[in-house]
Structures are given as structure tokens and as C-alpha cells.
Amino acid sequence: MRKLTSFVCGTGAGLAVYYLQRLRDPQATVNNSWTNSEKPVDPWALWDTNWDCREPRALVRPLRNSQPEEENRYNAELEKAKAKKARHIILVRHGEYLDVGDSDDTHHLTERGRKQAEFTGKRLCELGIKWDKVVASTMVRAQETSDIILKQIDFEKEKVVNCAFLREGAPIPPQPPVGHWKPEASQFLRDGSRIEAAFRRYFYRAYPDQEKESYTLIVGHGNVIRYFVCRALQFPAEGWLRISINHASITWLTISPSGNVSIKYLGDSGFMPAELLTHRIPRDAKNVV
């Protein structure tokens, strides 16, 4: 009996010490999942709210004091600087083309590339979008793709903006590097500055006086579109080459009034027959011209 009493007392004391220690342990309460934490796993995951330099707080004079008149002035200016509507930017890669000759003038769409552009034009027409602006790269393959699409959608060809900033190029050295494609450092410097300028030209939240959602169609190139996607979503831009998009595919990005950016489609080409799905440049004219 004495042994049993000693055992019970010892066990009880041990349990008491254990639970007391658990209560004192700062890690006694944990989240069920890392996604429940309000703190990002990596500081680089933090969203830059002023990425386009149009965050309302960055556009108005800061508070000079805590007087009601000054606070009213600040709040009124802040409200006036806020965007009200979203901007939708739809990016279309050119159709398949034949890489022959030393100049852009010889890089015309293949027959398959023209069919791809026709399907894309029909798809954009089916979406029923009222376009506010259509922009096309000045390279031949993008111009030909744009011309075919314009026959399908409700937009006047004379209003198309031709932009040399959108021409294909090498935006930034990719990570990881690839052995089959190694442009000179000077090409990255030249093309990268131009493509970044194109991004800043077309990607920004709406102006405060925009009263309805806007839709901009941009017909461009694979490298440029992939770079735009990484920049818009604030992913490391060096990762652009990890993305693959088909010829004449549709990528849809939305910039909300708050400045947040979301992607609706990435390289969508599911509206085409399987035999028209391509993403590489054919090196032989046989059966493609």
C-alpha cells in the first residue's frame, strides 16, 4: 500500500511539472499551417504597393500636423488620387513564323502561324471585349498577327499603336542559365532597358478619372511577354525563361484599383486544334510555309 501511494504521488508530481512547463513554453501554441501566418516566409514575398509609383499616399502631400483642417485636406487629396476601376492587359504572342534570312523583313508567318492568329482573333471576338487600345510590336511577324486578329475583333486598324519598344529581345540574363542561348552582355543591356521601358509604359494602375474598366490588347513576343508576367506579378524577373507560351496564345493580366496584379490566363491556347499548337521556331520551310 505504501509503495502504491508513493507511485501515485510521484506520477502526479511528474505530470504537474510537465504541464506547468508546457504552459510556460512560448511554443505551446502553433499555427495549423504556414499559410495561417500573417508573416511571409521570405521577406522577398512582400508586395511593393508603390511598384508603379502611383500609390495614393506617395502622390499627396504628407500630413504637416494633427489639426482637423490638415487631416481633412490630406484625406480629401488621398481620396482624389485613388484609382476607381481596373485595367485589363491582354498579351498575345505572334503566330508561328519561319526564321530565314538575316533581317526581320524575311520573318513572315507560316501558313500554320496565320491559322493560329485566325483562331486567336475568333477567340478574342467571342470574349465580347470592347477594346480601348490595341498595340503591336513593329516586327513583321507581330504586325501580320495583329492584322489577322483585327479582321475578327471590333477595332479600327487606323487606331492601332505600333510600338518599337515591344520588339523581341533579351530582357535579362535568365536563371538558371541555358547553354543553347547566350546573348552578349551588351545585348542584355540594350534590349533589357528597352523592354523594361515598355513594361513601364503599359503597366500601371488606372488614373483616378478612369470611370470604367479598360481593355488593352498587346501583340508581341515570347520573351517580352514572359518578362512582363514576372515583373507584373513581382516574381524574380530572372525566371522568365522558365515559362513557356505557345504561338498566338493569350495571357491576361489585371491591375486592380489598389495596384494589386492578378493573372487570369497564361499562354492560353486551348481554343486551337491540337495540330496548331506550337511554341518553337521551325528551322525548315518544308510543310510549314
From Swiss-Prot:
The protein's assembly and partners: Interacts with Pk92B/ASK1.
Main subcellular location of this protein, as a coarse class: mitochondrion
Protein name: Serine/threonine-protein phosphatase Pgam5, mitochondrial
Transmembrane stretches, start-end: 7-23
One GO process term, biological-process aspect: response to heat
Higher taxonomy: Eukaryota, Metazoa, Ecdysozoa, Arthropoda, Hexapoda
PANTHER family listed in its UniProt record: PHOSPHOGLYCERATE MUTASE-RELATED (PTHR20935), SERINE_THREONINE-PROTEIN PHOSPHATASE PGAM5, MITOCHONDRIAL (PTHR20935:SF0)
UniProt xrefs under SUPFAM superfamilies: Phosphoglycerate mutase-like
Entry-linked Pfam families: His_Phos_1 (PF00300)
Gene Ontology CC: one annotated term: mitochondrial outer membrane
Topology relative to the membrane: Single-pass membrane protein
UniProt keyword Transmembrane helix present: yes
Cited InterPro entries: His_Pase_superF_clade-1, His_PPase_superfam, Mito_Ser/Thr_phosphatase
GO molecular function, one term: kinase binding
EC annotation from Swiss-Prot or TrEMBL: 3.1.3.16
Role: Displays phosphatase activity for serine/threonine residues, and dephosphorylates and activates Pk92B kinase. Has apparently no phosphoglycerate mutase activity.
Organism, scientific name: Drosophila erecta (Fruit fly)
Class in the EC hierarchy, top level: hydrolase
Family: Belongs to the phosphoglycerate mutase family. BPG-dependent PGAM subfamily.
Keywords for the protein's UniProt record, in alphabetical order: Hydrolase, Membrane, Mitochondrion, Mitochondrion outer membrane, Transmembrane, Transmembrane helix
Gene giving rise to this polypeptide: Pgam5
